[in-house]
Amino acid sequence: MAEAQKTVRTLTGRVVSDKMDKTVTVLIERRVKHPIYGKYVKRSTKLHAHDESNQCRIGDLVTIRETRPLAKTKAWTLVDIVERAVEV
């Protein structure tokens, strides 16, 4: 029985919290057109992602992909760090 190939969902977002062990909170922003007024508005989603080596810092731009559930609220894992945050 041949299985259909699953499409891997990947998203890019900004790390807003790295206080948990091996977990980061990633803010995903998207623009949606308002159904009545036609204006584009920003919508955002916060996702928890698995960071095995604790390498992410707040402000990093990262790519994450969907995986099996790792915890109650964590079903995404870190793929790579696109851009490092500027050190202050």
UniProtKB/Swiss-Prot annotation:
Part of the 30S ribosomal subunit. Belongs to the universal ribosomal protein uS17 family. One of its GO terms (cellular component) is cytosolic small ribosomal subunit. One of the primary rRNA binding proteins, it binds specifically to the 5'-end of 16S ribosomal RNA. The keyword Metal-binding does not apply. NCBIfam families: PRK05610.1, uS17_bact. This is Small ribosomal subunit protein uS17. PANTHER family: 40S RIBOSOMAL PROTEIN S11 FAMILY MEMBER (PTHR10744), SMALL RIBOSOMAL SUBUNIT PROTEIN US17M (PTHR10744:SF1). It comes from the Bacteria. Pfam families: Ribosomal_S17. One of its GO terms (molecular function) is rRNA binding. One of its GO terms (biological process) is translation. InterPro entries: NA-bd_OB-fold, Ribosomal_uS17, Ribosomal_uS17_bact/chlr. Keywords: Ribonucleoprotein, Ribosomal protein, RNA-binding, rRNA-binding.
